[in-house]
Amino acid sequence: MTQASPANLLKNALEHGELELKGQFLLGSNYTFLVKVRHEGQEIPAIYKPARGEQPLWDFPEASLAGREVAAYLVSEALGFNFVPLTVLRADGPFGSGSLQQSIEYDPNYHYFTFSESDRERLRPVALFDLLVNNADRKGSHLLIEKGTNKLWLIDHGLCFHAEDKLRTVLWDFAGEALPDELLATLRTLRSILAHSRSAPHAPISTTLPSYLQPEELASLAARADCLLANPVFPHPPEDRRAYPYPPL
């Protein structure tokens, strides 16, 4: 009998495991909880964000942020970046439906503003990802380096995928640079997926994203990819609106 991969075991645990509340994160405007997931002998720490704990926003639909967290994970996987921790939607959370995300162990004092030059150089795919998902809140503390592995992770994607241009990020380091060839190839792959190409890897994302995003948001995602393919350059910060999140950390 074929053994399930660690990734599949983790996904199965997050989707079906028993959730025990362990604590609440008090920073941030939305309710966020640390939970312990128990499943088939595993005990896994995870981050639970219930939709009912989301503060109302004038520019995002009510109770939609949890689904956007899942959509960001799906797009990261489709791009092959794999830097959003595994994220699922749980309808049966302790406080109702919400996102459930693999917890990452990291040093909170090591983030974008304290990264080494070599770690900063790793961030071009992040800049592209944020352009595509239209991240309205890329703070410096949302970029993590995992302890023990030095793997780059990204968190907090509830304010993504708006149909209008909302990009607010601390990461403008590469403004004016041409997109590297490998990122262009990745971008073409994503565009094929969004066009429902049967030959594209991860094609099922084209059928799962509509569960979390509005039709106009999906259309805007495809349009942003098209714009970057037509003009493959990292943009400069806009001058006609706010380009940086507040607070930046």
Q: Model-predicted segments: where are they?
A:
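Conserved ATP-binding subdomain of kinase catalytic cores across diverse folds
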Residues: 8-136, 140, 147-157, 169
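C-terminal catalytic region of ATP-dependent kinase domains
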Residues: 24, 61, 146-249
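Catalytic domains of riboflavin
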Residues: 3-4
